[in-house]
Protein backbone atom coordinates (compact mmCIF):
# COMPACT_ATOMS: atom_id res chain seq x y z
CA UNK A 1 0.00 0.00 0.00
CA UNK A 2 2.95 2.30 0.61
CA UNK A 3 3.99 1.87 -3.00
CA UNK A 4 0.49 2.65 -4.23
CA UNK A 5 0.27 5.79 -2.12
CA UNK A 6 3.65 6.95 -3.34
CA UNK A 7 2.72 6.44 -6.96
CA UNK A 8 -0.80 7.84 -6.60
CA UNK A 9 -1.88 11.43 -6.30
CA UNK A 10 -0.78 12.72 -2.89
CA UNK A 11 -1.42 16.06 -1.29
CA UNK A 12 0.74 17.87 -3.83
CA UNK A 13 -1.50 16.77 -6.72
CA UNK A 14 -4.79 17.34 -4.90
CA UNK A 15 -5.25 20.78 -6.44
CA UNK A 16 -5.13 19.25 -10.00
CA UNK A 17 -7.97 16.79 -9.36
CA UNK A 18 -11.70 17.38 -9.35
CA UNK A 19 -14.05 15.74 -6.89
CA UNK A 20 -16.81 13.93 -8.77
CA UNK A 21 -19.26 14.49 -5.92
CA UNK A 22 -19.13 18.28 -5.48
CA UNK A 23 -17.53 18.98 -8.92
CA UNK A 24 -14.93 21.25 -7.32
CA UNK A 25 -11.23 21.07 -6.68
CA UNK A 26 -10.37 18.36 -4.19
CA UNK A 27 -10.01 19.76 -0.68
CA UNK A 28 -8.59 17.55 2.10
CA UNK A 29 -7.85 14.59 -0.13
CA UNK A 30 -9.58 11.32 0.72
CA UNK A 31 -8.80 8.00 -1.02
CA UNK A 32 -11.22 5.10 -1.01
CA UNK A 33 -9.91 1.64 -0.20
CA UNK A 34 -9.31 -0.62 -2.03
CA UNK A 35 -10.03 1.24 -5.31
CA UNK A 36 -7.94 4.36 -4.35
CA UNK A 37 -10.18 6.92 -6.07
CA UNK A 38 -9.73 10.57 -5.07
CA UNK A 39 -12.54 12.65 -3.50
CA UNK A 40 -12.94 15.40 -0.95
CA UNK A 41 -12.83 13.74 2.45
CA UNK A 42 -16.05 15.42 3.63
CA UNK A 43 -17.79 14.47 0.38
CA UNK A 44 -16.84 10.79 0.40
CA UNK A 45 -17.54 10.50 4.11
CA UNK A 46 -21.05 11.87 3.58
CA UNK A 47 -21.46 9.56 0.59
CA UNK A 48 -20.48 6.43 2.52
CA UNK A 49 -22.92 7.34 5.29
CA UNK A 50 -25.76 6.51 2.87
CA UNK A 51 -24.07 4.10 0.43
CA UNK A 52 -20.95 1.98 0.89
CA UNK A 53 -20.29 1.74 -2.85
CA UNK A 54 -17.68 3.89 -4.56
CA UNK A 55 -19.28 6.64 -6.72
CA UNK A 56 -16.97 5.77 -9.65
CA UNK A 57 -16.46 2.00 -9.73
CA UNK A 58 -19.34 0.85 -7.47
CA UNK A 59 -17.08 -1.45 -5.49
CA UNK A 60 -17.60 -1.70 -1.71
CA UNK A 61 -15.59 0.89 0.22
CA UNK A 62 -13.83 -0.56 3.23
CA UNK A 63 -12.08 2.58 4.51
CA UNK A 64 -11.07 6.13 3.54
CA UNK A 65 -7.48 7.36 3.69
CA UNK A 66 -7.04 11.07 4.49
CA UNK A 67 -4.47 13.46 5.98
CA UNK A 68 -1.91 11.84 3.69
CA UNK A 69 1.50 13.36 4.40
CA UNK A 70 3.75 10.55 3.22
CA UNK A 71 3.64 6.85 2.46
CA UNK A 72 3.69 5.99 6.14
CA UNK A 73 1.91 9.03 7.62
CA UNK A 74 -1.82 9.12 7.02
CA UNK A 75 -5.14 8.55 8.76
CA UNK A 76 -7.70 5.90 7.95
CA UNK A 77 -11.45 6.30 8.41
CA UNK A 78 -13.21 2.95 8.57
CA UNK A 79 -16.60 2.54 6.92
CA UNK A 80 -19.12 0.43 8.83
CA UNK A 81 -22.06 -0.67 6.65
CA UNK A 82 -23.93 -2.07 9.66
CA UNK A 83 -24.43 1.42 11.15
CA UNK A 84 -27.10 2.27 8.58
CA UNK A 85 -29.19 -0.89 8.88
CA UNK A 86 -31.64 0.75 11.23
CA UNK A 87 -32.57 3.39 8.65
CA UNK A 88 -33.10 0.95 5.78
CA UNK A 89 -35.24 -1.66 7.51
CA UNK A 90 -39.01 -1.27 7.04
CA UNK A 91 -39.69 -2.79 10.46
CA UNK A 92 -40.28 0.41 12.42
CA UNK A 93 -43.43 2.46 12.54
CA UNK A 94 -43.40 6.11 11.54
CA UNK A 95 -42.60 7.20 15.09
CA UNK A 96 -41.88 5.81 18.53
CA UNK A 97 -43.31 7.64 21.53
CA UNK A 98 -40.81 7.55 24.40
CA UNK A 99 -42.23 8.39 27.81
CA UNK A 100 -40.57 8.64 31.23
CA UNK A 101 -40.00 5.16 32.59
CA UNK A 102 -39.48 3.51 29.20
CA UNK A 103 -36.72 0.90 29.05
CA UNK A 104 -34.98 0.66 25.70
CA UNK A 105 -33.33 -2.70 25.02
CA UNK A 106 -30.30 -2.40 22.73
CA UNK A 107 -30.02 -6.00 21.49
CA UNK A 108 -28.87 -7.32 18.09
CA UNK A 109 -31.60 -7.72 15.45
CA UNK A 110 -33.65 -10.88 15.64
CA UNK A 111 -33.58 -13.39 12.75
CA UNK A 112 -37.38 -13.55 12.64
CA UNK A 113 -39.91 -10.90 11.60
CA UNK A 114 -38.84 -7.66 13.23
CA UNK A 115 -42.39 -6.40 13.73
CA UNK A 116 -43.04 -9.13 16.26
CA UNK A 117 -40.02 -8.07 18.30
CA UNK A 118 -41.69 -4.80 19.34
CA UNK A 119 -43.48 -5.67 22.57
CA UNK A 120 -46.80 -4.16 23.51
CA UNK A 121 -46.75 -1.75 26.52
CA UNK A 122 -47.58 -3.50 29.78
CA UNK A 123 -48.37 -1.77 33.08
CA UNK A 124 -46.34 -2.92 36.09
CA UNK A 125 -45.15 -1.48 39.35
CA UNK A 126 -41.89 0.41 39.09
CA UNK A 127 -40.45 -1.64 41.97
CA UNK A 128 -40.91 -4.98 40.17
CA UNK A 129 -38.44 -6.28 37.57
CA UNK A 130 -39.47 -5.17 34.09
CA UNK A 131 -39.69 -8.11 31.69
CA UNK A 132 -41.96 -9.45 28.99
CA UNK A 133 -44.78 -11.82 30.09
CA UNK A 134 -43.80 -14.26 27.30
CA UNK A 135 -40.00 -14.26 27.13
CA UNK A 136 -38.62 -14.97 23.68
CA UNK A 137 -35.16 -15.93 22.44
CA UNK A 138 -33.88 -12.36 22.88
CA UNK A 139 -35.51 -11.63 26.24
CA UNK A 140 -35.74 -14.16 29.04
CA UNK A 141 -36.36 -14.16 32.76
CA UNK A 142 -32.64 -14.68 33.38
CA UNK A 143 -32.07 -11.06 32.39
CA UNK A 144 -33.65 -9.68 35.56
CA UNK A 145 -31.56 -6.80 36.94
CA UNK A 146 -29.67 -8.01 39.99
CA UNK A 147 -27.07 -6.13 42.01
CA UNK A 148 -24.98 -9.27 42.68
CA UNK A 149 -24.16 -10.35 39.12
CA UNK A 150 -24.77 -7.67 36.49
CA UNK A 151 -24.74 -9.09 33.00
CA UNK A 152 -23.17 -7.56 29.90
CA UNK A 153 -26.51 -7.07 28.20
CA UNK A 154 -27.67 -4.99 31.17
CA UNK A 155 -25.00 -2.41 30.42
CA UNK A 156 -26.40 -1.93 26.91
CA UNK A 157 -29.91 -1.07 28.13
CA UNK A 158 -30.98 2.37 29.26
CA UNK A 159 -32.91 2.15 32.53
CA UNK A 160 -33.63 5.57 34.04
CA UNK A 161 -35.16 5.75 37.52
CA UNK A 162 -38.95 5.66 37.48
CA UNK A 163 -41.57 6.86 39.94
CA UNK A 164 -44.14 4.79 41.79
CA UNK A 165 -47.00 6.46 39.94
CA UNK A 166 -45.58 5.96 36.44
CA UNK A 167 -45.88 2.49 34.84
CA UNK A 168 -42.85 0.70 33.42
CA UNK A 169 -42.84 0.04 29.69
CA UNK A 170 -40.51 -2.29 27.83
CA UNK A 171 -39.73 -1.65 24.17
CA UNK A 172 -37.34 -3.83 22.22
CA UNK A 173 -36.09 -2.53 18.88
CA UNK A 174 -34.67 -4.76 16.18
CA UNK A 175 -31.60 -2.61 15.52
CA UNK A 176 -29.24 -1.25 18.15
CA UNK A 177 -27.57 1.27 15.86
CA UNK A 178 -30.80 3.22 15.33
CA UNK A 179 -31.35 3.91 19.01
CA UNK A 180 -27.68 4.64 19.62
CA UNK A 181 -27.85 7.41 17.03
CA UNK A 182 -31.00 8.77 18.67
CA UNK A 183 -29.88 8.79 22.30
CA UNK A 184 -26.11 9.18 22.37
CA UNK A 185 -24.56 12.56 21.63
CA UNK A 186 -21.69 11.39 19.44
CA UNK A 187 -22.89 12.50 16.03
CA UNK A 188 -20.36 14.68 14.17
CA UNK A 189 -21.13 18.39 13.81
CA UNK A 190 -24.56 18.24 15.52
CA UNK A 191 -23.57 17.69 19.16
CA UNK A 192 -25.49 20.67 20.48
CA UNK A 193 -28.49 20.00 18.23
CA UNK A 194 -29.48 16.70 19.87
CA UNK A 195 -32.73 17.22 21.80
CA UNK A 196 -33.14 15.98 25.36
CA UNK A 197 -35.26 12.84 24.96
CA UNK A 198 -37.33 11.91 28.00
CA UNK A 199 -36.49 8.39 29.06
CA UNK A 200 -32.75 8.57 28.34
CA UNK A 201 -29.84 8.84 30.73
CA UNK A 202 -29.41 12.56 30.03
CA UNK A 203 -33.07 13.29 30.80
CA UNK A 204 -32.75 11.75 34.27
CA UNK A 205 -30.24 14.47 35.15
CA UNK A 206 -32.45 17.32 33.90
CA UNK A 207 -34.66 19.16 36.44
CA UNK A 208 -38.36 18.47 36.02
CA UNK A 209 -40.98 20.98 37.04
CA UNK A 210 -44.73 20.92 37.40
CA UNK A 211 -45.16 17.39 38.77
CA UNK A 212 -46.33 15.11 35.96
CA UNK A 213 -46.57 17.88 33.35
CA UNK A 214 -43.63 16.49 31.39
CA UNK A 215 -45.65 13.34 30.65
CA UNK A 216 -47.93 15.42 28.43
CA UNK A 217 -45.05 16.14 26.05
CA UNK A 218 -43.88 12.82 24.53
CA UNK A 219 -40.97 12.94 22.11
CA UNK A 220 -41.58 11.52 18.65
CA UNK A 221 -38.52 9.99 16.99
CA UNK A 222 -38.85 9.49 13.24
CA UNK A 223 -37.28 6.60 11.38
CA UNK A 224 -35.68 8.59 8.59
CA UNK A 225 -34.41 11.37 10.84
CA UNK A 226 -30.77 11.24 9.81
CA UNK A 227 -28.58 13.43 12.08
CA UNK A 228 -26.79 14.78 9.01
CA UNK A 229 -29.98 16.30 7.54
CA UNK A 230 -31.67 18.23 10.30
CA UNK A 231 -35.38 18.99 9.93
CA UNK A 232 -35.23 21.70 12.59
CA UNK A 233 -32.78 24.50 13.27
CA UNK A 234 -30.22 23.54 15.95
CA UNK A 235 -29.78 26.87 17.70
CA UNK A 236 -30.62 26.00 21.29
CA UNK A 237 -27.14 25.07 22.42
CA UNK A 238 -26.74 23.03 25.60
CA UNK A 239 -22.94 22.83 25.73
CA UNK A 240 -22.46 25.72 28.13
CA UNK A 241 -18.78 24.91 28.61
CA UNK A 242 -17.97 25.54 24.94
CA UNK A 243 -16.96 29.08 24.07
CA UNK A 244 -17.94 31.08 21.01
CA UNK A 245 -19.51 29.55 17.92
CA UNK A 246 -17.92 26.12 18.46
CA UNK A 247 -21.06 24.90 20.24
CA UNK A 248 -23.05 25.14 17.00
CA UNK A 249 -22.86 22.88 13.92
CA UNK A 250 -20.06 23.56 11.47
CA UNK A 251 -22.42 24.18 8.56
CA UNK A 252 -23.95 27.12 10.47
CA UNK A 253 -20.64 28.98 10.82
CA UNK A 254 -21.25 31.33 7.81
CA UNK A 255 -24.47 32.60 9.41
CA UNK A 256 -22.83 32.99 12.81
CA UNK A 257 -19.88 34.85 11.30
CA UNK A 258 -22.23 37.27 9.57
CA UNK A 259 -24.13 37.85 12.81
CA UNK A 260 -20.89 38.71 14.62
CA UNK A 261 -19.81 41.22 11.96
CA UNK A 262 -23.27 42.74 11.47
CA UNK A 263 -24.07 43.19 15.14
CA UNK A 264 -20.62 44.70 15.72
CA UNK A 265 -21.62 47.42 13.23
CA UNK A 266 -24.92 48.13 14.97
CA UNK A 267 -24.25 47.76 18.70
CA UNK A 268 -21.61 48.29 21.33
CA UNK A 269 -19.14 45.39 21.82
CA UNK A 270 -20.46 44.45 25.25
CA UNK A 271 -24.00 43.71 23.99
CA UNK A 272 -23.13 41.94 20.72
CA UNK A 273 -23.00 38.43 22.19
CA UNK A 274 -26.28 38.67 24.21
CA UNK A 275 -28.05 40.12 21.18
CA UNK A 276 -26.77 37.32 18.96
CA UNK A 277 -27.99 34.64 21.37
CA UNK A 278 -31.40 36.31 21.51
CA UNK A 279 -31.64 36.39 17.71
CA UNK A 280 -30.63 32.72 17.46
CA UNK A 281 -33.28 31.88 20.02
CA UNK A 282 -35.89 33.62 17.87
CA UNK A 283 -34.68 31.62 14.84
CA UNK A 284 -35.11 28.43 16.84
CA UNK A 285 -38.69 29.48 17.65
CA UNK A 286 -39.92 30.93 14.33
CA UNK A 287 -37.64 29.09 11.88
CA UNK A 288 -38.04 30.65 8.44
CA UNK A 289 -41.19 32.61 9.31
CA UNK A 290 -40.25 36.06 8.03
CA UNK A 291 -43.27 37.81 9.55
CA UNK A 292 -42.65 36.34 13.00
CA UNK A 293 -38.96 37.24 12.92
CA UNK A 294 -39.66 40.82 11.87
CA UNK A 295 -42.24 41.26 14.62
CA UNK A 296 -39.91 39.91 17.31
CA UNK A 297 -36.76 41.72 16.16
CA UNK A 298 -38.31 45.14 15.50
CA UNK A 299 -37.74 46.21 19.09
CA UNK A 300 -34.00 45.54 18.60
CA UNK A 301 -33.39 46.69 15.02
CA UNK A 302 -36.11 49.31 14.39
CA UNK A 303 -35.80 50.58 10.80
CA UNK A 304 -33.08 48.02 9.95
CA UNK A 305 -35.36 45.05 10.66
CA UNK A 306 -36.40 44.46 7.03
CA UNK A 307 -32.96 44.19 5.38
CA UNK A 308 -31.53 42.41 8.42
CA UNK A 309 -34.12 39.62 8.32
CA UNK A 310 -33.82 39.34 4.52
CA UNK A 311 -30.05 38.83 4.68
CA UNK A 312 -30.38 36.45 7.61
CA UNK A 313 -32.91 34.20 5.85
CA UNK A 314 -30.80 34.22 2.69
CA UNK A 315 -27.78 32.89 4.59
CA UNK A 316 -29.97 30.47 6.54
CA UNK A 317 -31.23 28.89 3.32
CA UNK A 318 -27.70 28.54 1.97
CA UNK A 319 -26.40 27.00 5.21
CA UNK A 320 -29.19 24.40 5.45
CA UNK A 321 -29.27 23.56 1.74
CA UNK A 322 -28.54 19.79 1.49
CA UNK A 323 -26.55 20.29 -1.72
CA UNK A 324 -24.11 22.58 0.11
CA UNK A 325 -23.52 20.49 3.24
CA UNK A 326 -20.69 18.54 1.59
CA UNK A 327 -19.09 21.44 -0.31
CA UNK A 328 -15.97 23.35 0.59
CA UNK A 329 -15.77 25.88 3.37
CA UNK A 330 -17.33 29.26 2.54
CA UNK A 331 -18.17 32.45 4.43
CA UNK A 332 -20.80 35.13 4.12
CA UNK A 333 -18.22 37.36 2.41
CA UNK A 334 -18.40 35.07 -0.63
CA UNK A 335 -21.98 36.26 -1.22
CA UNK A 336 -23.36 39.61 -2.36
CA UNK A 337 -24.54 40.60 1.13
CA UNK A 338 -23.43 44.00 2.40
CA UNK A 339 -23.38 44.99 6.06
CA UNK A 340 -25.97 47.46 7.33
CA UNK A 341 -24.28 50.55 8.73
CA UNK A 342 -25.06 51.59 12.29
CA UNK A 343 -25.56 52.51 14.98
CA UNK A 344 -29.22 51.70 15.61
CA UNK A 345 -31.27 54.86 16.28
CA UNK A 346 -34.79 54.85 17.64
CA UNK A 347 -37.11 56.40 15.03
CA UNK A 348 -39.47 59.37 15.41
CA UNK A 349 -37.77 61.23 18.28
CA UNK A 350 -38.40 64.94 18.88
CA UNK A 351 -35.82 67.58 19.77
CA UNK A 352 -36.68 67.25 23.48
CA UNK A 353 -35.98 63.49 23.47
CA UNK A 354 -39.66 62.48 23.68
CA UNK A 355 -40.84 59.78 21.31
CA UNK A 356 -43.84 60.93 19.30
CA UNK A 357 -47.01 58.87 19.20
CA UNK A 358 -48.13 56.80 16.26
CA UNK A 359 -50.99 59.26 15.63
CA UNK A 360 -51.01 60.63 12.11
CA UNK A 361 -51.88 64.13 13.33
CA UNK A 362 -48.59 64.30 15.25
CA UNK A 363 -46.30 62.61 12.76
CA UNK A 364 -47.38 64.83 9.88
CA UNK A 365 -46.17 67.86 11.84
CA UNK A 366 -43.03 66.56 13.52
CA UNK A 367 -41.17 63.57 12.08
CA UNK A 368 -37.47 64.38 12.02
CA UNK A 369 -35.17 66.87 13.79
CA UNK A 370 -34.60 68.61 10.45
CA UNK A 371 -38.23 69.74 10.37
CA UNK A 372 -38.10 70.97 13.96
CA UNK A 373 -35.48 73.57 13.07
CA UNK A 374 -37.90 75.16 10.55
CA UNK A 375 -40.54 75.91 13.20
CA UNK A 376 -40.78 79.28 14.96
CA UNK A 377 -41.06 79.80 18.71
CA UNK A 378 -43.70 81.89 20.48
CA UNK A 379 -42.50 85.16 22.10
CA UNK A 380 -41.64 84.68 25.77
CA UNK A 381 -41.25 80.89 25.49
CA UNK A 382 -37.85 79.33 25.96
CA UNK A 383 -36.58 77.30 23.01
CA UNK A 384 -36.82 73.57 23.51
CA UNK A 385 -39.78 73.65 25.89
CA UNK A 386 -42.38 70.93 25.40
CA UNK A 387 -45.12 73.08 23.83
CA UNK A 388 -45.67 70.88 20.78
CA UNK A 389 -45.21 71.42 17.08
CA UNK A 390 -45.28 74.87 15.45
CA UNK A 391 -46.21 75.57 11.87
CA UNK A 392 -45.81 78.79 9.91
CA UNK A 393 -48.55 80.20 7.77
CA UNK A 394 -47.45 82.87 5.29
CA UNK A 395 -49.91 85.39 3.87
CA UNK A 396 -48.24 87.57 1.27
CA UNK A 397 -49.75 90.91 0.11
CA UNK A 398 -48.32 93.82 -1.85
CA UNK A 399 -46.49 95.30 1.13
CA UNK A 400 -47.46 93.06 4.07
CA UNK A 401 -46.01 89.70 5.01
CA UNK A 402 -47.63 88.22 8.06
CA UNK A 403 -46.45 85.15 9.98
CA UNK A 404 -48.90 83.34 12.20
CA UNK A 405 -47.61 80.65 14.53
CA UNK A 406 -50.10 78.01 15.61
CA UNK A 407 -49.54 75.83 18.64
CA UNK A 408 -51.29 72.50 18.19
CA UNK A 409 -50.30 71.12 21.58
CA UNK A 410 -53.01 69.79 23.86
CA UNK A 411 -52.96 71.24 27.38
CA UNK A 412 -54.99 68.42 28.91
CA UNK A 413 -55.55 64.68 28.60
CA UNK A 414 -58.51 65.38 26.32
CA UNK A 415 -56.07 65.52 23.42
CA UNK A 416 -56.43 61.74 23.03
CA UNK A 417 -60.14 62.26 22.26
CA UNK A 418 -59.47 64.81 19.51
CA UNK A 419 -60.19 68.06 21.42
CA UNK A 420 -57.18 70.42 21.31
CA UNK A 421 -56.72 74.04 22.44
CA UNK A 422 -55.09 76.30 19.88
CA UNK A 423 -53.52 79.69 20.54
CA UNK A 424 -52.65 82.39 18.05
CA UNK A 425 -49.76 84.82 18.48
CA UNK A 426 -49.10 87.85 16.31
CA UNK A 427 -45.62 89.38 15.91
CA UNK A 428 -47.12 92.91 16.41
CA UNK A 429 -48.12 92.10 20.01
CA UNK A 430 -51.82 91.35 19.48
CA UNK A 431 -53.66 89.49 22.22
CA UNK A 432 -53.85 85.70 22.08
CA UNK A 433 -57.30 84.42 21.14
CA UNK A 434 -58.06 80.83 22.22
CA UNK A 435 -60.17 78.77 19.88
CA UNK A 436 -61.79 75.44 20.80
CA UNK A 437 -63.07 74.59 17.34
CA UNK A 438 -62.89 70.91 16.47
CA UNK A 439 -61.41 71.36 12.98
CA UNK A 440 -58.20 73.03 11.92
CA UNK A 441 -59.82 74.63 8.88
CA UNK A 442 -62.34 76.48 11.07
CA UNK A 443 -59.58 77.88 13.28
CA UNK A 444 -57.56 79.11 10.32
CA UNK A 445 -60.62 80.79 8.82
CA UNK A 446 -61.33 82.54 12.13
CA UNK A 447 -57.73 83.77 12.38
CA UNK A 448 -57.81 85.09 8.84
CA UNK A 449 -60.94 87.17 9.56
CA UNK A 450 -59.42 88.68 12.71
CA UNK A 451 -56.21 89.66 10.98
CA UNK A 452 -57.99 91.17 7.98
CA UNK A 453 -60.32 93.23 10.23
CA UNK A 454 -57.44 94.62 12.32
CA UNK A 455 -55.38 95.69 9.31
CA UNK A 456 -58.10 97.17 7.14
CA UNK A 457 -56.85 99.89 4.83
CA UNK A 458 -53.17 98.97 5.09
CA UNK A 459 -52.63 97.38 1.74
CA UNK A 460 -54.18 93.97 2.37
CA UNK A 461 -55.44 92.42 -0.87
CA UNK A 462 -59.15 92.40 -1.63
CA UNK A 463 -59.14 88.64 -1.88
CA UNK A 464 -58.18 88.31 1.80
CA UNK A 465 -60.76 90.95 2.86
CA UNK A 466 -63.59 89.05 1.19
CA UNK A 467 -62.64 85.85 2.94
From Swiss-Prot:
- The Enzyme Commission number assigned here is 2.3.2.27
What Pfam families does this protein map onto?
Answer: zf-C3HC4
Native source organism of the sequence: Varicella-zoster virus (strain Dumas)
Subunit structure of this entry? Interacts with host BTRC; this interaction seems to inactivate SCF-mediated protein degradation in general.
Q: Does the keyword NADP apply?
A: no
The name this protein goes by in its record: E3 ubiquitin-protein ligase IE61
Q: Where does each RING-type zinc finger lie?
A: 19-58
Q: What does this protein do?
A: RING-finger E3 ubiquitin ligase that degrades host SP100, one of the major components of ND10 nuclear bodies, thereby disrupting the organization of these bodies. Also plays a role in the inhibition of host NF-kappa-B pathway by blocking the SCF(BTRC)-mediated addition of ubiquitin chains to host I-kappa-B-alpha/NFKBIA, thereby interfering with its degradation.
Q: Which gene encodes it?
A: 61
* Stated consequence of mutating residue 19 to G: Loss of SP100-containing nuclear bodies dispersion
